[in-house]
Every structure is written in structure tokens, then in C-alpha cells.
Amino acid sequence: MQPPAFKELWIILRLAGPLIASQMAHMLMVFTDTVMMGKIGPEALAGGGLGAATYSFISFFCVGVMAAVGTLVSIRHGAGDSEGVTRLTQAGLWLAWGMALIAALLLWNLEPILLQLGQAEANVHMAAQFLITLPFALPGLLSFMALRGFTSALGRAGPVMTISVAGAVANFVLNYAMINQWLGLPNLGLMGIGLVTAMVTNCMALALAWHIKRHPAYAAYPISKGLSKLSRSHLKELWRLGLPIGGTYAVEVGLFTFAAFCMGAMGSTQMAAHQIALQTVSMAFMIPVGISYAVTMRIGQHYGAGNILMARTAGRLGIGFGGSVMLLFGIFFWLAPHWVIGLFLDLDDPAFAEIVVLAAKLLAIAAWFEFFDGTQTIAMGAIRGLKDARTTFLIGLGCYWLIAAPAAWLLGFYADGGASGVWWGLALGLFCSAVALTYAFEWKTARLLRKEAVGAAVPG
């Protein structure tokens, strides 16, 4: 490995570290909300869980669309186009506010749809309470994502981490204070949990905006100046790239929702074991997610600067390093599944014996699962850095819903594989996705390098 490669890997990891911490802080906020629902009561946990799942599906799509901001800003930054960076970020904020309004209106009117889908009336009623206040978090969430993409694309992800961690702590403290009625605060139940999340999320966006406005590192990008004048061309560019990214997020979330339905059809033991394994995998998954974001930004910078060779190097380094890290997690899950399960359950309680055995089997499968999932996630980020989200969407759609979902169903039910069969089906789809996306990145960069060579050979 040549010294420039070491330097490139260090830059990627320095950018990825704060983004990984930010992702974990976001997960902690979701975990806090779930714990607080449980403190209210089992009915609130069930109904709040339904509301949270509905909100998550819609917000994941919106967050995926907003990921286009970071990609396009990194390309403009690499090209030295300061005005383009500013205009894209402004358009990203307008897109965030527009999507937040539409998504909130949809969430506020979901109650009859959930009833039509056969959800229990009591759960739907509780979910509707949660969804009265929670959608107010959307303007802050999506604005934060737009500004996160902007500052990360400039190589400055530290403020994102600091604000995210502070937000997670504030979310826990305020929720706990409201549930226990400290300082005379009212216990508003699920509405209160949604209200706290909305307040904290909007404050996070305002804090990041204030930092960007005040810090001299952003002086070349006066985002507040001319913000009222929406650039339709930049908005269209964001939407064109962001829509397939949001679609990819949606089909992946849909796949794991499908897996949960499969487990629910099998029984409570399978569902419990699935949740333990999935929560474990999801926490480790934040590492490749952070690396993927960093790789997207770094490749975008090289692509914008016209340095395709370094773009390919950055992608290969990110995919290789991320895959290696996830392989280590896989080995750990393989060798010490009971230690992991012990974080969730009392291993000595005979009531949990069947769940422990099944969860250990799923974590053994997760050893492979993690490597494939991490690799395909970073490869997706690498391709998006080349301003291509259509390829990632089509590969994701095919591998998730034409391979993973049918395989999970067939192995789980028709081959009598049970919960393990479902997970092997998911692993098969992720394996295919990892191979296809890695090949697609290599093919795209090779084609761009050939074009570059032809262009250099043609006399000016």
C-alpha cells in the first residue's frame, strides 16, 4: 500500500468517526423513547411501537432523499464551486421543509389506514396519540440532515457528533423528567415522548445552523444570504439524485419489516430471538453506515476535482476496511453469542431457555450477515459518490425483494428452516447485493478511467 493510500484511509476514518458516533446517538434516542414507552405501560409500548414503526418508515425515506445534499455538495466542493455548494445547501433546506410538511400531514391522517390494515383498535388509538406530536420533529430532523450533509462534505463532521450526543442526552433527561413529573412537569404519556423528541430534534438543527453561521470555516458559504430565493435547478438536481436514495432506504427497511412479519407468524419465541439478534446487528451496523457516508463524501470530492483514480482508491479502501471490521464483529458473534444475549436476558432463567438457544443460532448466522451487509452498504455509498443512485436502487430492489424476501419465506416456511431459514434468506440477499454493488463500483470507475484516458489522448 502506497503512502497516499494510508493518508486517504486516515482521512476517511477521521470523517467517519464523528458520523458513526452521530448514528449511535440517534439510535440511543430511539432506544430511550422505547424505554419510556415501557415505563408508561404495556399498552403504550405496543401502541407507541406501532406509531414509531410508521414514523420510522416515512422518515427513513425522507432522510434518504436528504442524503443527496452531502453527495452533491462534496462534488461541488471538490470542483471548487463555493456558490454551487451554497445554493445546493439552500435548496436542501427547502426540500427538507417541504417533505417535512407532506410527511407530517400523512402521519396525522394515518389512523383510518392503520385500522384498514387490520391493526388492533387499541394500538392504533395509542399510536395516533404518539403521532400527534412526533411529526413536529420532522422539520428539525430533515434540516439537521441537510446541514449535516453540507458540513460533512466539507470534511467537518465534528460538530455533528457533538450536537448529536448532546441531543441524545437531552432526550433522555427530558423524557425521564416528564415521565417522573420532576419540577412540576406534566406526564403527557406518549404525546409527551413525541413532544420531547420534537423539541430536542429541532434544537439540534438550530444548534448546527448557529454553529455554521458563526464559525469562520463556513464564511465562503453564506447559506442564510439569499435563502428566500429558491433555486429550482438545484432543487431538481437534489430530487433527481435523492429520490432513488430514499427508495433504496425504503426497500431495505421494508425487507426487515417483512422479516419481522415472518417471525410474528412463527411465534413469540422466534420474534423475541429475532429482536435480540437484530438489535445487536443494528448497533454494529452503525460503523459501516458512518464509513459509507464518509466514503460518499470523499469520493464526491475526488469526482468533483476530476481525480477518478483517487475516487476509486477511496472506495476500495472504504469497502476493504469496513468489510474487515464487520468480519471481526462476525467472529465475535460466532464465538461469544451468549455474552451478547446476556445483555438482553437472564441466561439462568428457564423461562428464556428457548429464546436463548434460538438467538444464539441467529447470531451465528449474523456472523456472515454482518460482513455482507457492511460491504454492500459501503459499496452503495461509493457508487453514490459518483453521482449515481439509480444503480444502487435497482440492485437493492432486485437483491432485497427478488432474492432475499422470497428466499427468507421459502427457507423459513417451506423448507422448515424457521427463524434461522429467514435469516439465511436475508443473508443470501445481502451477499448478492454486496457482490453486485462492489462489481458495479469497479465497473463504473474503470469506465470513467477509460474515458479520462481517451480524453487525455485527444489533442486539445
Curated annotation (Swiss-Prot):
The gene is norM. GO terms for molecular function: antiporter activity; xenobiotic transmembrane transporter activity. InterPro entries: MATE_fam (IPR002528), MATE_MdtK (IPR050222), MdtK-like (IPR048279). Belongs to the multi antimicrobial extrusion (MATE) (TC 2.A.66.1) family. It comes from Pseudomonas syringae pv. tomato (strain ATCC BAA-871 / DC3000). It is found in: Cell inner membrane. One of its GO terms (biological process) is monoatomic ion transport. This is Probable multidrug resistance protein NorM. The lineage of its organism: Bacteria, Pseudomonadati, Pseudomonadota, Gammaproteobacteria, Pseudomonadales. GO terms for cellular component: plasma membrane. Its main location: membrane. Keywords: Antiport, Cell inner membrane, Cell membrane, Ion transport, Membrane, Transmembrane, Transmembrane helix, Transport. Multidrug efflux pump. It is a multi-pass membrane protein. The chain crosses the membrane at residues 9-31, 51-73, 93-115, 125-147, 160-179, 189-211, 238-260, 275-297, 318-340, 350-372, 393-415, 419-441. It comes from the Bacteria. The keyword Ubl conjugation does not apply.
